[in-house]
Structures are given as structure tokens and as C-alpha cells.
Amino acid sequence: MNDTISWSTLAVILAAGQGTRMRSPLPKVMHPVGNRPLLGHVLAAVEAAGIEQVAVVLGAGGPMVADYLHQAAPSARLFTQHEQLGTAHALLAARGALQAHEQGCVLVLFGDSPLITSQTLSRLRQALIDGAAVAVAGFHSGQPGPYGRLLVEDGHLRAIREAKDASAEELQVSFCNGGVMGLRADSCLWLLERIGKQNAQGEYYLTDVVAVANSAGLPVTAVEVEEDDVRGVNDREQLLAAERIYRQRQANL
């Protein structure tokens, strides 16, 4: 096994979402949990994991978020997704950072997931070091209803099946897609450029990278994490839930 230290890691944080369900003029990733913006918690986890290379993809509210990043993460490279064409499209907006990072690991995070931990990031990175080309964070849920399912066979992640596309048998699977993932830098761009938009929304979905990698015969794995680690914030109710979990964690320190 290679030494973790020898694997340079780039964290790309997707923070371009419009956050319309927040019903607020404040950019979604700037809403606070524990007196810190959602994005600030993600940056803290990245720093705690020892990741020094950071790129952030901005969209709606870009100037305000950029001002915050200039203070909170002055070394981060900033990119803009000018059109909302899906998560893979957002990641490709950071092409400049991806091209400069030819070896090691690329971790893809979301700016609205304030409960992500450095341990989860380290485990995704380790999965890549251990040989996976793609590693996807997954969690077991007692109520998996709307979540995409991770279909694992003999230790390999074969597919991410969205709930609306899943068979009755697949809907019984409780292992769900956490969204956060890692990709080997040496195949990252090759995989992303082969993602199409043949779907109802006409968007480029990052989850399709699993199918592309499997078709190319590259190893794909799932890394089990706690559901709270990958819990996103899309509305006021979820913001309050994240605040409660954050306070519980702080009380348990």
C-alpha cells in the first residue's frame, strides 16, 4: 500500500447551487450553522484532513461567497459555473484545477453539507490509495425512500440507481448515495468528459461517473459513512436539523 502522505489531494467544493428553497437573499452556502457559514464547516473538515489544495465552484451569489473565501481560504482557487447544467458540469468548471492536479486524489464535496468530517474525507482518500478509481460515500438509512441506491456486488459498486428508476427489488436496498466522492486524479478528467446528458433534465450528473468507470473496467467502490456526515441543507427545516446535530456533536466533545 502506498503511504497516504505521498498522495497529493485536491478538494473541489461545489457551491454553485441557487438555494431557492431557502427563501433568502443570502447565498445558500452562507447560511450559518453554529455561527459559521455552511461552507466554512466544509473548509474546516478539508483543513483537518490535511488537504492543502482547494478549489471552489461558485454560481449564484458568487461575489459574496468569493469575498468570504478570500478571508477564510485565501489559497483556494475559485471557479464559476455560469449555467446550472448538473453536478458533473459544475465539477468540470474547475477544469483548470483538475488539469494542474495530474496525480493523487480528487475529493468532490458540497458546500451545503456542514456536517462532513475529516474522517470521512480520509476514508475516501484511502479507498483511492487502495486501488479504486472512484470511491462513493454511502450510508444506511431506515427510510431510504427518495435516496439513490448504491448497488454493490462482491465488494464493487456496480451502479447508483435513482429511486424513481429503481426496481421493486432495488428499492429494498438501504445503502444510499451520500453524494460525496473521490476520484483518482489520473483518470478524473477522462471519466468526466465521457458523461453525457441523456436524461430527463438534460444535465450532466456526477453520479454517472460510476457507470462510465465500470464500462471502462475501472474499479469502483463504496465507502460507508454516517448519514449525518453527508446530510445536505436545502431548506430551512434541514438547516435547523443541521444546527441540532452540530450542537449535539459539540456537547459530546
Segments predicted by a language model, with ranges:
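Glycine-rich N-terminal loop/short-helix segment of MobA-like nucleotidyltransferase
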Residues: 7-33, 49, 72
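Short, proline-centered helix/strand-breaking motifs
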Residues: 24, 113-114
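Short beta-strand/turn micro-motifs composed of small residues
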Residues: 15, 58, 110, 138-139
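Short N-terminal binding/cap micro-motifs at the start of the first secondary-structure element
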Residues: 19-23, 64, 145
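Conserved N-terminal catalytic core of the sugar/cofactor nucleotidyltransferase
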Residues: 1-10, 37-109, 115-126
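Hydrophobic packing residues within well-ordered alpha-helices of enzyme cores
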Residues: 22, 65-69, 124, 192, ...
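Conserved alpha/beta core of the MobA/IspD/sugar-nucleotide pyrophosphorylase nucleotidyltransferase superfamily
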Residues: 2-7, 174-253
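Conserved core of the sugar-phosphate nucleotidyltransferase
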Residues: 116-200, 207, 218-221
